[in-house]
């Protein structure tokens, strides 16, 4: 059940947020083209034991666009500013897809704000994606979203529904901009979640895990790595949204609640 909704004025942006449940704070960062409700059953599942603060990025859903390009770093700064306004000094963070990239940037740019990270279906560098994913990004058009849940959600919630082509173009530019982040510099432990048929290459997810201290023979190690990796069977990129039961259980165990 949604207990609160509102807008935070951050960095010239009126950023929409929802608060569900009670307990220790857990920030949920949705994927590209997504509103909070498109996260499906995950937010209610996590809100059973946590105070979930779910946001919508610039140009997404209830959050109107402004004259500013999209970037992972800027979205992370917006989220950090929202937490500051809410009086939340530190929180756990769950990010899916685009939100996973923002979560990584939040951990790198604002380490004091982040206790633990959950990175779902995201990469730390642009070469982590399958080539066909990049090809799809290059050829994407607004018309491809006609009749989809993403377009329907935008039309239902956006202050200016006619701005959808602008959203597509800005996300296209973001997606096609190369990046490579030093994930080994993350201070927060991370749970990496990926589908076995996701858009991010499995080798990339394993490499991320290794960069965070994973990939050891645990039975002979002094202790298990602080970060963890889970590969979800029979799961695609979009299909991660249908795995709320699996994911919420793993997230709860990792966060210790």
What spans do the regions from the language model cover?
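Conserved loop-alpha-helix segment in the C-terminal half of the alpha/beta-hydrolase fold
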Residues: 44, 194-235, 241-246
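Active-site nucleophile elbow and catalytic-triad environment of alpha/beta-hydrolase enzymes
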Residues: 167-183
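Flexible "cap/lid" loop of the alpha/beta hydrolase fold
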Residues: 101-109, 115-151
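Short beta-strand/loop motif that positions the catalytic acidic residue
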Residues: 186, 192-194
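N-terminal cap/lid segment of alpha/beta-hydrolase-fold proteins
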Residues: 1-14
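Conserved HGGG/HGGXW glycine-rich cap/lid loop of the alpha/beta-hydrolase fold
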Residues: 13-64
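Conserved alpha/beta-hydrolase "nucleophile elbow" surrounding the catalytic nucleophile
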Residues: 32, 91, 95-100
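Active-site loop/oxyanion-hole signature of alpha/beta-hydrolase fold enzymes
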Residues: 47, 53-94, 232
């Amino acid at each position: 059940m949604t207990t609160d909704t509102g807008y935070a004025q951050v960095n010239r942006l009126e950023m929409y947020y929802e608060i569900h449940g009670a307990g220790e704070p857990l920030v949920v960062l949705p994927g590209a083209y997504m509103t909070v409700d498109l996260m499906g059953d995950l937010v209610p599942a996590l809100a059973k034991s946590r105070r979930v603060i779910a946001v919508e990025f610039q140009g997404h859903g209830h959050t109107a666009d402004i004259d500013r390009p999209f970037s992972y770093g800027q979205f992370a700064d917006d989220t950090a500013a929202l937490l500051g306004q809410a009086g939340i000094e530190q929180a756990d963070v769950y990010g899916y897809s685009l939100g996973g990239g923002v979560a990584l940037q939040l951990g790198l740019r604002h380490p004091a704000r982040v206790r633990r990270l959950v990175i779902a279906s995201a990469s730390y560098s642009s070469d982590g994606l399958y080539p066909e994913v990049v090809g799809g990004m290059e050829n994407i058009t607004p018309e491809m979203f006609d009749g989809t849940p993403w377009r329907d959600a935008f039309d239902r919630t956006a202050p200016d529904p006619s701005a959808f082509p602008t959203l597509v173009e800005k996300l296209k530019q973001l997606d096609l901009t190369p990046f490579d982040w030093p994930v080994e510099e993350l201070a927060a432990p991370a749970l990496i979640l990926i589908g076995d048929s996701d858009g991010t290459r499995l080798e990339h997810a394993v490499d991320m895990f290794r960069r965070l201290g994973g990939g050891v023979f645990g039975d002979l190690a002094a202790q298990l790595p602080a970060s963890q990796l889970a590969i979800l069977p029979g799961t695609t990129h979009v299909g991660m949204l249908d795995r709320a039961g699996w994911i919420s259980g793993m997230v709860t165990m990792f966060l210790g609640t």
